[in-house]
């Protein structure tokens, strides 16, 4: 567990981050199933769906966890989402042609999109909680 500099309180709440991760994965799976049945069309729309899922997951993690660690909880949700997505992709096609769809630019863009969504969601939750605490 990470400790804060001043008060010694927890910054990362793993339960909150886990809830946010589950929410983000469920939103992505349900959204892609309902909106994109052929999996390879409308890449921009799929990116927006993933970004929205991470915003929601990061926001939930920021609301449930400690107020000082809202942003960190959002980041943990995003990193966990990347790990889950890569593990799911690893289960996919295997063999010499199985990884032909991997490109470095696409991977970087996906990861930046995911990390931005989780971080912004956590930041937004922290701002909301600080305003309501006043």
Can you say where each PLM-predicted feature lies in the sequence?
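Juxtamembrane/disordered regions of integral membrane proteins
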Residues: 1-134
């Amino acid at each position: 567990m990470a400790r804060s500099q001043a008060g010694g309180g927890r910054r990362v709440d793993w339960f909150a981050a886990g809830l946010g991760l589950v929410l983000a994965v469920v939103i992505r799976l349900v959204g892609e199933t309902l909106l994109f049945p052929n999996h390879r069309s409308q890449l921009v729309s799929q990116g927006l769906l993933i970004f929205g899922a991470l915003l929601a997951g990061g926001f939930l993690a920021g609301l449930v966890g400690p107020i000082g660690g809202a942003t960190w909880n959002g980041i943990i949700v995003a990193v966990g989402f990347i790990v889950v997505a890569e593990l799911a992709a690893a289960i996919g096609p295997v063999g010499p042609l199985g990884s032909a769809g991997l490109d470095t630019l696409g991977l970087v863009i996906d990861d930046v999109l995911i990390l931005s969504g989780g971080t912004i969601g956590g930041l937004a939750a922290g701002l909301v909680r600080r305003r309501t605490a006043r």
